[in-house]
């Protein structure tokens, strides 16, 4: 496997599954204002089309060209082929195939940053933030002036995962974005990500505003930056200035990733109903976009429209079967419908891909603990004990779970 700075664990970003009422503030799907799968999509690593050595014909005889290829030509050509294969599979959302191809490229040339960057991309596409961070860190180590890798690493570091290192990650996200704009001062996305990183740190100040405005100045068609600036101004108490910026972002948005970002920002501002038409537009463009499906499912769960949420969330899990969050939200929908066996199945699947922080959240009231409570209410004590035990396995230090387990096992 490719060498990375941190142990690559499975999966995704954290949402404690958020709601019993609309008034509860939900975590952003892809980050505070950032974007992960379907919201920020870094471009594919560049794969060179290497020309193979071909014979030439002289005086009726076939002989090789006089230029002798380097000894590692075959390795280089195979590496480029694997990159191309990974890129094509990624574009088709065949993530397992893409991962295998990029990993194969990394095995051939372990210090070529493009393989690590490609792996980071497909992990980010699936919201496997910890995996993506590890891969992008390797890419930056191998190519410290690669602006695309710096920006991508900044993106994944702003994804909310919980844990004690959140503040450190946000500081690093700012550092990598700042380095990117120093290397390329005309990189609009890098300026936008600098604003995101500053805002993630709680720094809603003139520099944050300037970063977003600089991104817009460099690319007036950059819908994402308008949405980010609008959200920052909302947080700064300047809601009247934010309204036309959201409108401009919606006007400029032409693709699902941008529409997802706008919808995500609206949901984070508790403007849930405003996010619905934006998500409908996104799904009209790409009915299988996993982020659009998940955001729509989340919107419906917030309003307790569980039956309507189910098909969106099920399809999201089909498109990204190893993603934690859609499974977690699907389990919440089943719990809301009192389909306890289905909820248990969804939570069991989610647990396979949860990080350590996510495991504790999955153990809670919107996970196995809530499932156990549901079984107790239905007088299914044996099933309740199983759910509480599962919760305790995920969060061993939780005394409340221990007490509930004891009660469920009592005759």
PLM region spans:
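N-terminal propeptides/low-complexity segments immediately following signal peptides
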Residues: 26-64
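TPR-adjacent "capping" and linker segments in tetratricopeptide-repeat scaffold/adaptor proteins
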Residues: 64-81, 356-365
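Helix-start (N-cap) detector for alpha-helical repeat units in TPR-like alpha-solenoids
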Residues: 79, 113-114, 147-148, 188-189, ...
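Structural signature of tandem alpha-helical TPR/SEL1-like repeats
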Residues: 93-100, 104, 125-138, 161-179, ...
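Canonical tetratricopeptide repeat
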Residues: 118, 152, 193, 228, ...
